[in-house]
Amino acid sequence: FGVSTLSEELVGCDRTKLRAMVPTEVLDALPPAEQLYTMGNNATYEVALAQGTTVRIDMVQIRTARGNDLGRLWLAQDITERRRRERTLERLATTDTLTGLTNRRAFMARLEAEITHIAHGAPPAAFLMLDLDHFKRVNDTWGHATGDKVLVHLANLLRGNLLRKQDMAGRLRGEEPAVLLPNTTVEQGHAIAERLRIALEQSTIASDDGQSIRVTMSVGLCPVLPDSASTLASSDAALYQAKNTGRNRVVRADTTKA
């Protein structure tokens, strides 16, 4: 875009220098120069600069009382801090405060979205319901602070490289996280669940008094079904079976039953 002679006079600076003050990222984000003065309405652009700053640019059309076009006024505002606060609030609204996993509300919204995608032809997805074995014993023996450490430890495993980028782990209730595995068959989901189970079994957690604690978990596995209630019920049934057949194992749901 150009810089007017009036702008030079107002700020006492050569127009070439004025134009050079505008970051390249901003120039790249704006419409081509030939379009700027044919645009009939006000417009807003948001640009992320290389140094991490976010700038909002408002283009305001200036007209006379009779409606004649006088030009455009460009207003630039640093909104970096505002966007940072918004991201923080969004994270708090969707994250479990103890574990850092996705909270139930956000997780269920993602599950519903995945169900819709599958209904419209997307590949199948798998669903895991996890439950720490004898977790009450951990709380009773070492205290709730250590119990919280165990939950955080499991959450860290889930957030680590054991899951793929497209997978989502959430805390649905108490010591029962769940994992949504998009574009995943039940067979592939079983392999992922086993990898998670073994990783937890082979790890240790330090109690508040310095003792090393080992815990295991049971996993109920099912395909994502046509509605969330059926998906949760199916994975819960498989989890219940895993608990009642020795714990520390992965059980697939029998979805052939009516």
Give the ranges of each region predicted by the language model.
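A short pre-motif secondary-structure segment
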Residues: M168-R171
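Sensory coupling linkers of modular signal transduction proteins
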Residues: I62-D96
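PAS-family sensory domains
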Residues: F1-G40
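Catalytic-core segments of nucleotide cyclases and related cyclic-nucleotide turnover enzymes
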Residues: H190-A193, C222-A258
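Short catalytic/binding micro-motifs of nucleotide second-messenger systems
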Residues: H117, G160-Q166, I198-S212, Q241
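Short regulatory alpha-helical coupling segments
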Residues: E90-R91, R104-P124, A155-R164, P182
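Conserved nucleotide-binding and Mg2+-coordinating catalytic segments in signaling enzymes
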Residues: E90-A109, L130-H144, V152
